[in-house]
């Protein structure tokens, strides 16, 4: 018989940098997960994506064992990296902070395709372009 899921914990953690300090420790401690076991496994699985924030969904079972799924980094993180900026515009309608090319948007859309609610590449690109627009990034 399959194990019964007790809780699902969603976190966003920098790749390769999970440690028992907040916010990871308290969130997993409440769920009764072996915190160090999770940190070691997460860091090993994400060490090649250093510098990016990785969303993770941890399924905690009744016997306190766990499995987790890592997702692709959030679109704004990928857009900031592509544009080479620290943060988006405070006033995206008035102040534009950077530009990205259609090819960069296409790459981001393809890498995020599995997590986006889009039927094809064009729809995924429109989602990413909308995110860029709301951050004050111009798409050329």
From Swiss-Prot:
GO molecular function annotations of the record: large ribosomal subunit rRNA binding; structural constituent of ribosome
Any one of the GO BP annotations: translation
Cited SUPFAM superfamilies: Ribosomal L11/L12e N-terminal domain, Ribosomal protein L11, C-terminal domain
Domain of life assignment: Bacteria
Keywords of this entry: Methylation, Ribonucleoprotein, Ribosomal protein, RNA-binding, rRNA-binding
GO cellular component: cytosolic large ribosomal subunit
Matches recorded under Pfam families: Ribosomal_L11 (PF00298), Ribosomal_L11_N (PF03946)
Residue intervals passing through the bilayer: none
InterPro entries documented for this protein: Ribosomal_uL11 (IPR000911), Ribosomal_uL11_bac-typ (IPR006519), Ribosomal_uL11_C (IPR020783), Ribosomal_uL11_C_sf (IPR036769), Ribosomal_uL11_CS (IPR020785), Ribosomal_uL11_N (IPR020784), Ribosomal_uL11_N_sf (IPR036796)
Cystines in this chain: none
PROSITE patterns: RIBOSOMAL_L11 (PS00359)
Entry PTM: One or more lysine residues are methylated.
Protein's job: Forms part of the ribosomal stalk which helps the ribosome interact with GTP-bound translation factors.
Family in the record: Belongs to the universal ribosomal protein uL11 family.
The protein's assembly and partners: Part of the ribosomal stalk of the 50S ribosomal subunit. Interacts with L10 and the large rRNA to form the base of the stalk. L10 forms an elongated spine to which L12 dimers bind in a sequential fashion forming a multimeric L10(L12)X complex.
Protein name in UniProt: Large ribosomal subunit protein uL11
